[in-house]
Amino acid sequence: MSSAMNWILSLGLFFLLKEQCYCIFAPNSTFLENLLNKYKDTTPHSRTRRAILRTDKEEIIQLHNKLRGQVHPSASNMEYMTWDDELEKSAEAWAEECIWEHGPTALLMSIGQNLAVHWGRYRQPAYHVQSWYDEVKDYTYPYPHECNPYCPERCSGPMCTHYTQIVWATTTKVGCAVNVCKRMNVWGDIWENAVYLVCNYSPKGNWIGEAPYKNGRPCSECPPSYGGNCQNNLCYKGDKHYGREGIVTNEVETPRFPEETPVWDHKKSNKPKAVPKTTQTSTENLMTQAIKCATKMRDSCKGSTCNRYKCPPGCINSKAKVFGTLFYDSMSSICRAAIHYGVIDNSGGLVDITRKGRLQFFVKSTRNSVESISKFKPANSFMVSKVSAQTIDCYTTVAEICQFVKPATHCPRFNCPAHCKNEPSYWAPVIGTNIYADSSSICKTAVHAGVIKDGEGGYVDVMPVEKKKHYFGSNKNGIQSDSIQNHKEGQAFRIFAVKQ
């Protein structure tokens, strides 16, 4: 491998996830100098430029459309993508912040977003676009007969949502920006002169339970507005690449944990000093979403961490609507539905959500001072349930309490004791990284994942998931987890910090 090999990392909406190795290389000073010169203004002492070069814009658009037109299985409704100036501006604003996470929060309600960062040798933005698309190798397309009513999420790698956002059929606009960050914290390491790429998309994709596109003969199901025009397997209106059109609403996944990337073992040279890897509590790796009284199920459901919410007090007096009884329409307020069902009272609290598929109608009733509304129209539904808390010891496993059962399983919020780190592995094993075998010790796993401190213990949230064939060990926070190949027993889980 070349000694100029660079670090490449990509981040895709939990925010998850679903993921923490680094690619080490010896940077070439000439490459780095050229890169910095390319993205800086020529005036003395000017700020780093975030606008992207027109040649890069054209390459990004051409590559997106090329990749969208060659999906397999073929897409019957894949639309042509154009550049959007407003999305570019929003990407510039976020790239300027030099924060390695999705944002800003207010904007994520209306756009999709892919992120990438590298350090060292120059890479064109299209290089990262291709790397996002390359997640296709881990993605299995859900055919219509598998969607009953929700399509299964089948990603055998650490992340597939960058790929699905790129090939989301109804996403028709993209705008990107590049910024050279003087100092950027990337998962605990401080990178100097980090090259940060932000691409914003609209309408956003990655709706939970939906396929990214319809399978069929190319252009056979294009929207009527395209007038039957087709170009390179894409629904096509004209040859205009750039536009100043408004942002349209849709949904994107926020990963909640970093990706597992291959380790390229090269000689170190001029690498920025890394922040010491000490035991620390992650403030970003959260499963519970804090929401408002008016937040609807459909508006809030982002990524796989879409089942636990924290409601504020005072929602009885809110005017947000609730449709149904027991089974609630996805356009209902989550918190008021929870009060209606009796899961929480007007003081707020935690609510677990279970999606229940499409129902033909919803029946009104008045319960706990909340009046729900009837709706005689088919829609997706959900149920609410109470979140309990359970104190456990260092040896308790997910398999003992809440092993994954399709379609979904909820676990209590667990309270871990301190000092589980040094418990022997034959009593308190930890198997895997980011996604763990459910025979692992919950509390020792929490220390390994960095969601609690060993000397303090504390609360953690757990999400049971389907088992993985392979689990890869790692040494994190003073704990060496185990690797297992061709694992056939049990299921798996993910673990999250709790923000008190």
Curated annotation (Swiss-Prot):
Q: Which PROSITE patterns match?
A: CRISP_2, LCCL
Q: Which SUPFAM superfamilies match?
A: LCCL domain, PR-1-like
Q: Does the keyword Disulfide bond apply?
A: yes
Pfam families registered for this protein in UniProt: CAP, LCCL
Cellular component aspect of the GO annotation: extracellular region
InterPro entries (alphabetical): Allrgn_V5/Tpx1_CS, CAP_dom, CAP_sf, CRISP-LCCL_domain, CRISP-related, LCCL, LCCL_sf
Protein name as it appears in the record: Cysteine-rich secretory protein LCCL domain-containing 2
